[in-house]
Amino acid sequence: MSVAVRTAFVLCAGWGKRLQPLTNQIPKPMVPICGIPLCQFALARIAAADVERIVINTHRLADEFIRLFPEYPQPSHFRGIPVLFRHEPVLLETAGGLKNIEDLLLPGPVLVHNGDILAALDLPALFAAHAKSGALCTLALRSSGGPLQVGFDRPTGLVTDIRGEIGSSAPRFLYTGVCVVDPALLPRIPPGEPLSFVPVWLDALRAGEKIAGVVLDDGIWRDIGNVEEYLRIHADLASGAVEIASPVEKSEWPRWRMPGARVDSSAKLNGWNWLGPDCQVSAGATVENSILWAGSKVEPGANVASSVVREGMLAAGEVHDTVV
């Protein structure tokens, strides 16, 4: 099996239903974290891992990727690395999405990385584990932080079960949404069908094939799965409870007040707040622990707390623990 991981596939085609109504305007991978699209954090880690090509799949609200890639849907670049796009008129899920870009893959294993997680995983360690394993796929795992559904035997480095389907008694770990797939797995995926990786992995395990894993507990890993978690990651960044390197080269990040944000002298800002470009906080308004997307407006006298005001929206009156 080939060693070098030359292609990265970033999964950006999901609906983001749990994050609605934020994802009514933009796809989940483009939801901003302190102004930076969520998928850009994955792209920055991938670029630092020296891959040679990045492929991104899209589905709903695909034109919003123009915000990050002005050339979309034409080929683009990220930090000098060629970026190709493949639109899915019908959502193909994870394994189906990978099969759908088979013609775009460079020879060798491919890194598959969810585009809607905030993570700083040690990708070179994942690559090394895969090269050593001789497995069809190597999963990046964590000991905690979400559903523990992958049975994993650490002494052998092999996955023994997924979602309890096989009945293994091995300790359970979290699958991070990041893995390395060997080309030998691709023939097991039928073309043109919506299919997740889980049944593909289970079929391989039942056939006696090796699926490997590596536990990567260092660095941040967050699934921004709902509005509460979206607010929480901003609160943690503001307090310093969480640190993550800037995904923008030669740029200070996070920035809490973006260019063009306007705050009336009689308005009050309490706690942490992220103020997007050209947003407006009007006279007598109070904003606390909230996120104002670009072009949003808090009306005079409004009281906004623990809320998100989406792009171009108006917040008036009492706005608490909600999305406008």
What function would you assign to each model-found segment?
Residues 15, 115-117:
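Active-site metal-binding loops of divalent metal-dependent hydrolases
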Residues 137-152:
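Short beta-strand-to-loop element that shapes/binds the nucleotide-sugar donor at the catalytic cleft/hinge
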Residues 206-286:
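Extended, small-residue-rich solenoid/repeat segments and analogous flexible loops
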